[in-house]
C-alpha cells in the first residue's frame, strides 16, 4: 500500500491544498464573472427591446392623433410589420383598451384579430397604465424557447388607448453565455494542469527538510542523539532545522542529569497549575502550593505538619494504605461558601526499591466544568422538548401500522411516507437548535418557498389532532387560497412550538382555536392560536420570548417546558419579516399572534 502512504504524506497534502485553493479561486472568479455577464447581457437585451417598443409607441400615438381610433387599424398593422423585421422579435400585437386584438405581426395568429386577449399581463398593463414584463416558454418551430414578453401601454392625452404586446426571443443571449462559459472552463482546466505541476515542485522544497527532521525524531526516540538535520537555507524551515539540532543536543546533555529526580519532578511540574499537597510517608503535610491554600481557604501555618486526610476531611473515608491501592479520582466540596468543587487525585512517591516515601494530592478546580455540565444537561432537557412532537406523531403512525394499517394498500404507504418525513424534519430540527447562534449572527440559511398556507396549516393541525385525542381543535381559516413565501421546515417548527404549548397548558375540556385573517391592503396575514389554559401574568407576557425564560420554573419543568421554544420561534418569524407576540389573561388562557407577508390568489391571477 505504498501509494496509499504517499497519498497521506505532507507533500501530497500540500499539493492538494494548493490545487484546491486555485480551484476555489477560479470558481469564485467564474461565478462572479458569469453572473455579472449574464446580468449585463440580459439588461442590454431588455433595454434594446424597451427602446424599440417606445419608438413603436410614439408611432402609434401619431396614427391615432391623425386618423382616430376607427381608421387607424390598417396603419397600425403596417407599423407593426415594419417594426417586426428584427431577428429577436417573435411577435408584436396591438390591443385596444377593451382588450381587443387590433393587429399582429404573426401570420398564423391573424385569426385572433378582433378577438379579446385573455393574457393577464395585458389586462394589468391596461388597468394600471404601466409597462410590465415576464418570461414564458414558447415553440417557434424549433422547440421550446425562452421568450421575454413586454407590455407597454399607449396613451393619448394621458388616457390609455391600447397596449403593445411584444414577444422577443431571449434564447440567443443564453446561448452566447454558454459559449463564453465553455471557453472559461477550458482555460480553467489548462490553468489547473499547470498549477498541479508547479505545486508538486514547490511542495517538494518544503517537505524535504521536514522529512529529514521526522527521521531524526525517530532516531531520538530510540535514544540516538548524535545525528543532525541538514540545513537547506536561512528561511523558517532552516531556522526550524537549526532549532531542532540545538534541541537534540540539549536533550542529550540533560538526559544524564535528570534521570534520578524524574519521577518526583514530573509529578510536581505536571500539576503546578493545580493545587499540590505533598506529604511524608506518614501522611503529614510537608509541601503545599499557593493554589492549594487558595482552594482550601486556609493559611500555610494551619496546614503544614497536619495529616492530609484530616485537612481534606477524609479521615472517616480513607486510610493511607488505601490511597496506595486506590488510584481513582473523586469530587470534593472544598469551600461551601464559594461553591468550590475540586477533583482530587492521589499518587504515591515510590523509590526504585518499592519503598513508599510520601504521597501527593492534586486538587483540580472543576467548579466551572461542573457548571458547564449542569448547563449541558439543562440544554439537553430543553432540546428534548423540541423533539417530542415529531416523535409523538411518528409513534402514532407506527402504532396504526402495528394495529393493522400496514395491510391497507392505500393507508400504509401514506403512513410510511409521513413517518419518513417526520424523521427527516426531526434531524433538521436538531441542527437548527444547535445552530441558534447562527441565527443571532444572521448566518443561518432561510430556504424560502412559495407555500399554500391553507394546506400548510391544516396539515400541521391534522397531525396534532391525530396525536392529541383529548384536545378539541377549532379552525377559522378563510376558503380563499392564501400564498406566502417562507421556509416550511422552520415555520413548521414555529407552529409546532406554539401548538404544543397551547395543548400542554390547557385545562379541563382542552380547546385550541386557530384564526387566520388577511389584510389585502398591506399584503399581510395574522394567525391567532388561542388556548383555554392557565394564562400568564400580565407583567410577564413580554418576557416569554426571552431565551430560557420560565413564568413558573417548577410548573414549567413539571410539564416539560424548556423556555427555548418561543425564543427560537421569535427568531424564525422575524427572519421572515414577520412579528410574533402574545396576549393573556391569567386563568382564562393565552393567545399567540403571528403576522406574515402573504398574497391572496384567486382564479385568473396567474400568468399564462
UniProtKB/Swiss-Prot annotation:
Entries under SUPFAM superfamilies matching the protein: ATPase domain of HSP90 chaperone/DNA topoisomerase II/histidine kinase, HAMP domain-like, Homodimeric domain of signal transducing histidine kinase, PYP-like sensor domain (PAS domain), Sensory domain-like
CDD domains: HAMP (cd06225), HATPase (cd00075), HisKA (cd00082), PAS (cd00130)
Keyword Plastid: no
PROSITE patterns associated with the record: HAMP (PS50885), HIS_KIN (PS50109), PAC (PS50113), PAS (PS50112)
Residues where Zn(2+) binds: 271, 274, 364, 368
GO biological process: osmosensory signaling via phosphorelay pathway
Top-level enzyme category: transferase
Record-annotated HAMP domain positions: 204-256
Membrane topology: Multi-pass membrane protein
Catalysis performed (reactions): ATP + protein L-histidine = ADP + protein N-phospho-L-histidine
Activity regulation remarks: By zinc. Zinc-binding negatively regulates WalK kinase activity and thus autophosphorylation.
PAS domain span: 261-331
Protein role: Member of the two-component regulatory system WalK/WalR that regulates genes involved in cell wall metabolism, virulence regulation, biofilm production, oxidative stress resistance and antibiotic resistance via direct or indirect regulation of autolysins. Functions as a sensor protein kinase which is autophosphorylated at a histidine residue in the dimerization domain and transfers its phosphate group to the conserved aspartic acid residue in the regulatory domain of WalR.
Listed name of the protein: Sensor protein kinase WalK
Amino acid at each position: 500500500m505504498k501509494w496509499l502512504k504517499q497519498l497521506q504524506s505532507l507533500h501530497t497534502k500540500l499539493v492538494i491544498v494548493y490545487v484546491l485553493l486555485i480551484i476555489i479561486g477560479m470558481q469564485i472568479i467564474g461565478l462572479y464573472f458569469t453572473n455579472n455577464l449574464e446580468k449585463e447581457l440580459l439588461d442590454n437585451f431588455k433595454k434594446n427591446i424597451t427602446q424599440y417598443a417606445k419608438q413603436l409607441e410614439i408611432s402609434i400615438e401619431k396614427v391615432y392623433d391623425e386618423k382616430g381610433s376607427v381608421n387607424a387599424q390598417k396603419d397600425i398593422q403596417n407599423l407593426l410589420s415594419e417594426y417586426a423585421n428584427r431577428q429577436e422579435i417573435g411577435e408584436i400585437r396591438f390591443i385596444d383598451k377593451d382588450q381587443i386584438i387590433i393587429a399582429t405581426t404573426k401570420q398564423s395568429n391573424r385569426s385572433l384579430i378582433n378577438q379579446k386577449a385573455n393574457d393577464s399581463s395585458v389586462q394589468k398593463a391596461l388597468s394600471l397604465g404601466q409597462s410590465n414584463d415576464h418570461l414564458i416558454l414558447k415553440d417557434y418551430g424549433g422547440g421550446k424557447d425562452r421568450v421575454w414578453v413586454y407590455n407597454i401601454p399607449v396613451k393619448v392625452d394621458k388616457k390609455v388607448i391600447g397596449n403593445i404586446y411584444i414577444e422577443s426571443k431571449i434564447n440567443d443571449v443564453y446561448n452566447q453565455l454558454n459559449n463564453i462559459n465553455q471557453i472559461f472552463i477550458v482555460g480553467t482546466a489548462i490553468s489547473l494542469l499547470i498549477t498541479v505541476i508547479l505545486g508538486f515542485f514547490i511542495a517538494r522544497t518544503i517537505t524535504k527538510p521536514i522529512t529529514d527532521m521526522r527521521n531524526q525524531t525517530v532516531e531520538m526516540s530510540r535514544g540516538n542523539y548524535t545525528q543532525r538535520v541538514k540545513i537547506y537555507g536561512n528561511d523558517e524551515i532552516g531556522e526550524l532545522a537549526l532549532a531542532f539540532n540545538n534541541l537534540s543536543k540539549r536533550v542529550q546533555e540533560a538526559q544524564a542529569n535528570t534521570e534520578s529526580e524524574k519521577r518526583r519532578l514530573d509529578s510536581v511540574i505536571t500539576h503546578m497549575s493545580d493545587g499540590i499537597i505533598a506529604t511524608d510517608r506518614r501522611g503529614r503535610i510537608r509541601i503545599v502550593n499557593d493554589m492549594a491554600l487558595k482552594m482550601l481557604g486556609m493559611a500555610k501555618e494551619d496546614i503544614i505538619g497536619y495529616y492530609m486526610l484530616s485537612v481534606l476531611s477524609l479521615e472517616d473515608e480513607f486510610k493511607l494504605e488505601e490511597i496506595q491501592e486506590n488510584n481513582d479520582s473523586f469530587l470534593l466540596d472544598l469551600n461551601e461558601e464559594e461553591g468550590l468543587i475540586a477533583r482530587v487525585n492521589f499518587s504515591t512517591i515510590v523509590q526504585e526499591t518499592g519503598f513508599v516515601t510520601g504521597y501527593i494530592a492534586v486538587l483540580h478546580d472543576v467548579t466551572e466544568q461542573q457548571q458547564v455540565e449542569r448547563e449541558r444537561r439543562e440544554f439537553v432537557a430543553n432540546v428534548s422538548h423540541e423533539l417530542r412532537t415529531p416523535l409523538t406523531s411518528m409513534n402514532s403512525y407506527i402504532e396504526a401500522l402495528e394495529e393493522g394499517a400496514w395491510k391497507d394498500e392505500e393507508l400504509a404507504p401514506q403512513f410510511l411516507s409521513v413517518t419518513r418525513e417526520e424523521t427527516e424534519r426531526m434531524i433538521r430540527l436538531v441542527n437548527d437548535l444547535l445552530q441558534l447562534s447562527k441565527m443571532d449572527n444572521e448566518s443561518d440559511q432561510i430556504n424560502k418557498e412559495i407555500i399554500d398556507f391553507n394546506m400548510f396549516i391544516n396539515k400541521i393541525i391534522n397531525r396534532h389532532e391525530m396525536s392529541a385525542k383529548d384536545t378539541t381543535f377549532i379552525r377559522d381559516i378563510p376558503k380563499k387560497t392564501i400564498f406566502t413565501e417562507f421556509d416550511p421546515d422552520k415555520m413548521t417548527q414555529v407552529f409546532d412550538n406554539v401548538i404544543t404549548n397551547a395543548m400542554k397548558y390547557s385545562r379541563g375540556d382542552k380547546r385550541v382555536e386557530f384564526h387566520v385573517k388577511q389584510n389585502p391592503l398591506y399584503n399581510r396575514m395574522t394567525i391567532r392560536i388561542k388556548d383555554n389554559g392557565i394564562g400568564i401574568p400580565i407583567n410577564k407576557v413580554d418576557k416569554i420570548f426571552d431565551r430560557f425564560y420560565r413564568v413558573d420554573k417548577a410548573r414549567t419543568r413539571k410539564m416539560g417546558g424548556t423556555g427555548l421554544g418561543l425564543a427560537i420561534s421569535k427568531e424564525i418569524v422575524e427572519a421572515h419579516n414577520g412579528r410574533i407576540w402574545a396576549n393573556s389573561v391569567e386563568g382564562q388562557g393565552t393567545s399567540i399572534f403571528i403576522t406574515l407577508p402573504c398574497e391572496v390568489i384567486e382564479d385568473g391571477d396567474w400568468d399564462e
